[in-house]
Curated annotation (Swiss-Prot):
InterPro entries: Calcineurin-like_PHP_ApaH, Metallo-depent_PP-like, MPP_MPPE1, PGAP5/Cdc1/Ted1. It comes from the Eukaryota. GO terms for cellular component: endoplasmic reticulum exit site; endoplasmic reticulum-Golgi intermediate compartment membrane; Golgi apparatus. A divalent metal cation 2 binds at D75, D117, H251, H307. Its main location: endoplasmic reticulum. Pfam families: Metallophos (PF00149). Its EC number is 3.1.-.-. A motif (Di-lysine motif) lies at residues 394-398. This is Metallophosphoesterase 1. Keywords: ER-Golgi transport, GPI-anchor biosynthesis, Hydrolase, Manganese, Membrane, Metal-binding, Transmembrane, Transmembrane helix, Transport.
Length: 398
């Protein structure tokens, strides 16, 4: 004999069942579309390009055409075939693709810099696995002709110093057109790209080559800053870029003892802040850091690697910003930096992406509501719930 509840379910008209099923499909689809598409627009839409102060030399306001809009992100860590579970890949790569494409569409930057560790297993990749990783990267981080993408090498792309080989470095350079010691100048602003892994200081072939290029570039940049009426003899034959202090872009941060002085909601967690950093592993060595500061006297340094945010002042008041990871796999609240930059000034703003915990909370709440709706529809709720439903129905009828 059928129970009363089952009798109610079986007696529901077919048309009513189909209508209810369509409502459920619409509800589930709406939740999916919101959590996987619209939430990115909702969150990133709140980000704005920061304003730049007046030109230090002329006193005039900078025009939009003279300001370079640059996006900086780091540590995407696309999973590989060894450690990457397919579901983890699907979830994290979809999050980064939607975040990146939404940011490009809403913010329309002139140039985007990715500060290393593009891949998680680049240091181990076979040629076939490397080709697959590159293909996925190019799909996720595709960009319009109005935007330029510049990628800097990290330790997961070519390995730490003891794993780095000429083959791995050239493989990365071929795909991303990256060279340590490369100068990129846009709208009069100079960016210096550094291969942090090659700053070991042990005289290896790759390290010597990278340092020689950096020294030569520092000579050109320093010559460009000389007074036109009092040029030094050694600068007479140098090819001079625009006279603007450079911005240093690299994967490893410059030397600091730890993240103890870092603050903010996306800084390292309290239990990790006081862990001492290891030179040439967590940060550059003191010697390499001093070299870069001495060679270039940068006005700003941007780095990644630690997966957490930090802002420090180096000797001479030179600021360094460590950019958190762009991936949910490494943190719950990823972000990127928006920079409005001129040859003489810059202004930075951090743009947070949707929190993974909030997306999960929406799914849990939607799932719970879905269960309640199904039980209520078939009158399978326990008495207290059913009584509340009857009261609501009577109130609507009145």
């Amino acid at each position: 004999m059928l129970s009363p509840n089952l009798t109610i379910v079986k007696n529901l008209p077919l048309k009513k069942r189909i209508c209810f099923l369509l409502k459920l499909v619409c509800f589930v689809s709406s939740v999916l579309i919101f959590c996987e598409f619209f939430i990115y627009y909702l969150v990133i839409f709140q980000c704005r390009w920061p304003d730049v102060k007046r030109d230090a030399h002329t006193g005039n306001e900078e025009t939009p055409a003279s300001v370079l809009k640059a996006m900086f992100l780091a540590d995407t860590h696309l999973l590989g075939e060894i450690k990457g579970h397919w579901l983890d890949k699907l979830r994290r790569e979809w999050q980064m693709e939607r975040s990146f494409q939404t940011a490009l569409w809403l913010l329309q930057p002139d140039i985007v810099f990715i500060l290393g560790d593009v891949f998680d297993e680049g240091k181990w990749d076979s040629p076939q696995a490397w080709a697959d990783d590159v293909r996925r990267f190019q799909k996720m981080f595709k960009y319009p002709v109005t935007t330029e993408l510049v990628v800097i090498v990290g330790n997961h792309d070519i390995g730490f110093h003891y794993e780095m080989t000429t083959y791995k470095v050239h493989r990365f350079e071929k795909v991303f057109n990256f060279t340590s010691g490369k100068l990129i100048t846009r709208k009069g602003t100079n960016f210096v790209l550094v291969n942090s892994v090659a700053m070991e200081g042990d005289g290896c072939t790759l390290c010597r080559t990278a340092e020689a290029k950096l020294v030569a570039l520092s000579h050109r940049l320093n010559c460009s800053l000389q007074e036109p009426n009092h040029p030094q003899k050694r600068c007479s034959d140098a090819e001079k870029p625009p006279a603007s202090q450079p911005i240093l872009l690299q994967h490893y941060p410059l030397y600091r003892k730890s993240d103890a002085e870092c603050s903010g909601e996306d800084a390292a967690p309290p239990e990790e802040k006081n862990i001492p950093f290891k030179e040439k592993y967590d940060v550059l060595s003191q010697e390499a850091s001093q070299k870069l500061l001495w060679w270039f006297r940068p006005r700003l340094i941007l780095s990644g690697h630690t997966h957490s945010a930090c802002q420090v002042l180096h000797t001479g008041g030179i600021p360094e910003i460590s950019i958190p990871s762009f991936s949910w796999r490494n943190r719950n609240n990823p972000s990127f930096i928006m920079g409005s930059i001129t040859p003489t000034d810059f202004s930075l703003h951090k743009c947070f992406l949707p929190r993974e915990s909030r997306v999960f909370a929406i799914y849990w709440a939607a799932g719970a509501l879905l269960v309640v709706l199904v039980l209520a529809h078939f009158q399978l709720l326990t008495p207290p719930f059913y009584f509340a439903q009857r009261l609501i129905s009577k109130h609507k009828a009145a």
